[in-house]
């Protein structure tokens, strides 16, 4: 179980979502942190802080061959919980479960890029936000689902902090599928660089481009196909 100190830390860092770099009054673990109804996929996208009750599902996702190929964390439950506990205790990172309607489907880490090791590789602004992501449920995969919920996530991040002008990702450089889908949403590849554990590509999206070109299509309108591909 989480220690009392870790529970306190976890409750406090949730407020980084709403108050930027400052901490505010705590919220209950398990509460919906942010949500957005996405007309493009006609589903409600919501976020909750991960907790111990999510561990079995998280382990199943990490042991999915499609996820393991890029995350390389097909570990035991004990080791997975150690990893998540470290993320929960990190005041600059929010480890989250993403939901489509009532279905938990994704693990997401939203973090302050200027406080992350990524800042050693690009000129990070103080309010740049970074994302790590995986989709664990096969039924929630596919390009239209991705366009919808990723647009909602980007919108929620920008709305949480008006000073955030950029969102960045650093996927493995050979993750062509993810980079193609992110490019559709305005996240352009800037350059490649080396982390100790991978060759990475820096993807970057901006607030201005997102609201001028992306959100009106994938965040505010119904999909023209009328179905999920």
Residue ranges and their predicted role:
Residues 2-52, 211-229:
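Conserved N-terminal entry element of GNAT/NAT acetyltransferase domains
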Residues 114, 188-202:
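Conserved catalytic-core motifs of GNAT/GCN5-like acyltransferases
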Residues 173-191:
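Conserved active-site alpha-helix within GNAT-family acetyltransferase domains
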Residues 159-171:
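Conserved GNAT acetyl-CoA-binding A-motif
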Residues 97, 103-114:
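Conserved beta-strand in the GNAT
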Residues 112-141, 145:
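Conserved acyl-donor/pantetheine-binding loop and adjacent beta-alpha core of acyl/acetyltransferases
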Residues 74-94:
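Active-site rim helix/loop that mediates acceptor-substrate recognition in acyltransferases
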Residues 142-157, 180:
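Conserved acetyl-CoA-binding loop-helix of GNAT-fold acetyltransferases
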